[in-house]
């Protein structure tokens, strides 16, 4: 993403700061098991149907899916809350998860890194998808600033 930013002839000081945080917490991050995660879980991207009286769910629009730390799924769920306050999301996830989220110090660090990662995605994405005259540009400006601030607050 930092290379994408450079190709747009821009520089991301907050992205570089995030990379330094990743280096600082690499021992914590290396312990995370990987699985398919989705940074774009919100109601328009979820399809539900009933089969034999049971609700089945499907995700659509997976352009922000990747193989990585499962804690990233929580970034967009109840997104303005810190991990420990995402009671509904944690309860639903933990009810079906093989490995529940316990909101440990390490999980909070991993969550903060993922918030910063989404901030970096939004920061860089605006250079390729929008101009300053588009609503999306300004949404990404403010949203990425919020994600970075929250991330760096959790990575002190």
Where are these regions (language model features)?
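Short, surface-exposed acidic
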Residues: 11-15, 98-110
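Pre-DFG segment of protein kinase catalytic domains
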Residues: 36, 58-61
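ATP/Mg2+ or Mg2+-diphosphate-binding catalytic cores
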Residues: 6-7, 13, 122-156
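An alpha-helical support segment within catalytic cores of ATP-dependent transferases
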Residues: 1-39, 49-51
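Active-site activation/catalytic loop segments of kinase-like enzymes and analogous catalytic loops
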Residues: 71-102, 115-133, 143-145
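Hydrophobic residue at the +6 position relative to the catalytic HRD Asp in the kinase catalytic loop
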Residues: 44-48
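Conserved active-site beta-strand element of glycosyltransferases/polysaccharide synthases
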Residues: 67
